[in-house]
Amino acid sequence: MRARELRAQTLDQMKDELAKLKKEQFNLRFQKATGQLEKTARVRQVRRDIARIKTFLHQKLSESKV
């Protein structure tokens, strides 16, 4: 997910995307533990997407409070 796409999203859309990515991260961890994970780079990508979304959420929340 690109930063440009995130800036265009509303808070609710970001929260939905964050929940979806957390579920995916959970499933990827299980697949990794059982040895079924084929694309190991996806774990890193999802983790970074989660961090990116949290960063933009925090920025939007702080902007709305000011």
From Swiss-Prot:
Pfam families in the cross-refs: Ribosomal_L29
Q: Does the keyword Ribonucleoprotein apply?
A: yes
Q: Which UniProt keywords apply?
A: Ribonucleoprotein, Ribosomal protein
Report whether Ribonucleoprotein shows up as a keyword of the record.
yes
**GO MF terms, alphabetically ordered:** structural constituent of ribosome
Give the family this protein belongs to, as stated in its UniProt record. Answer: Belongs to the universal ribosomal protein uL29 family.
Gene this protein is translated from: rpmC
**Would you tell me the Gene Ontology cellular component terms?**
cytosolic large ribosomal subunit
Protein name (record): Large ribosomal subunit protein uL29
Gene source species: Bartonella tribocorum (strain CIP 105476 / IBS 506)
Checking InterPro entries in the record gives: Ribosomal_protein_uL29 (IPR050063), Ribosomal_uL29 (IPR001854), Ribosomal_uL29_CS (IPR018254), Ribosomal_uL29_sf (IPR036049)
Which Gene3D superfamilies does the UniProt record give?
6.10.140.1970
Q: Give an example GO biological process.
A: translation
Organism superkingdom: Bacteria
